[in-house]
Every structure is written in C-alpha cells, then in structure tokens.
C-alpha cells in the first residue's frame, strides 16, 4: 500500500488582539492566492490586521519547507479562516466612584497552505486507482408530447 504524504501544512495564531471582522476583511483578500502574491498584497494593504496575518503566512511557509521540504513557489493558501476568541473585560475608573466596562475582543486565525506540486502527483495516482467504480450511463429517452398526442389520447 502506498503511504500518502501530507500536502497541507498550517499555522494557527490564537488570542490575537483585534476584532474578527477586521481580520476577515484582510483574510478574504488572500484566500486562494499563491505565497508570493500573498506577501505582496499583505505588505501593501494599509490595515493593522496585516502584520499578524503576515507573520502567520511566514510561519506556515516555514512549516512547509521544514516538514515537507517543499519550495515556497509551489505553495498556495488553500484555507484561511478567522474565528472569534475570548473577550477580555476590564473596568476603567470614572468620576464619582463609577466604572466603565472595556471589552477587548480577540480572534483566532488559521492559515492552511497546500503544496500544488505534491498535490498533482497524488492526484494522478488516485485517478488511476479509482477506475474500477464506473458509473452506469443513464441515457434519458426523449418523448415528444405534442406529436404523440400527449397523455390524454390514450383511452
């Protein structure tokens, strides 16, 4: 039996101190892009969320080169998601002994990268393996309702 090699690596950043909606705005721009194109996009975007995402993309690429020995030119971001994390709650003292609650939102960012050169090799092997399950052809017959008299001519 052939041992299937992993073609995906990931980097996970937890408890990043920013809103999940603001991070999603940046993540939506880089999903499905190549590694080099992602770096250019993140360096030129003027959002605060770009820096932690850029660090995660670098980390995922380093994981791919170390764990799989893949080249960075073959990497594509296959999955990128942002989930809401815990909310840090603090109290700010105000006048006359009162306090004002401060809610600091956090998020968890996951970047999954796929090596397309390894994916192509295993895609060819799996397509050769699945030939025994053929789908039966279900050719539909065409009935002309107007020339045959329709359903109501049968008595």
Swiss-Prot record:
InterPro entries (alphabetical): Ribosomal_uL22, Ribosomal_uL22_bac/chlpt-type, Ribosomal_uL22_bac/org-type, Ribosomal_uL22_CS, Ribosomal_uL22_sf
Keywords: Chloroplast, Plastid, Ribonucleoprotein, Ribosomal protein, RNA-binding, rRNA-binding
GO MF annotation list: rRNA binding; structural constituent of ribosome
Main subcellular location: plastid
GO biological process assignments: translation
Localisation: Plastid, Chloroplast
GO CC annotations on file: chloroplast; large ribosomal subunit
Entries under NCBIfam families matching the protein: rplV_bact (TIGR01044)
Known function: This protein binds specifically to 23S rRNA.
Protein family according to the UniProt entry: Belongs to the universal ribosomal protein uL22 family.
Subunit structure: Part of the 50S ribosomal subunit.
Name listed for the protein in its UniProt record: Large ribosomal subunit protein uL22c
């Amino acid at each position: 039996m052939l041992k299937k090699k992993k073609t995906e690596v990931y980097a996970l950043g937890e408890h990043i101190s920013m809103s999940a909606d603001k991070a999603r705005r940046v993540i939506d721009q880089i999903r499905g892009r190549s590694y080099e194109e992602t770096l250019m996009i993140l360096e030129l975007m003027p959002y605060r969320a770009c820096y932690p995402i850029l660090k995660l993309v670098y980390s995922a690429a380093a994981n791919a080169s170390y764990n799989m020995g893949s080249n960075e030119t073959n990497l594509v971001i296959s999955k990128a998601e942002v989930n809401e994390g815990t909310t840090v709650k603090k109290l700010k003292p105000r006048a006359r002994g009162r306090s004002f609650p401060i809610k600091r939102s956090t998020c968890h960012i996951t970047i999954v990268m796929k090596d397309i050169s390894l994916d192509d090799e295993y895609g060819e092997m799996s397509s050769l393996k699945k030939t025994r399950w053929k789908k039966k052809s279900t050719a539909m017959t065409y009935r002309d309702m107007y020339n045959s008299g329709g359903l109501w001519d049968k008595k």
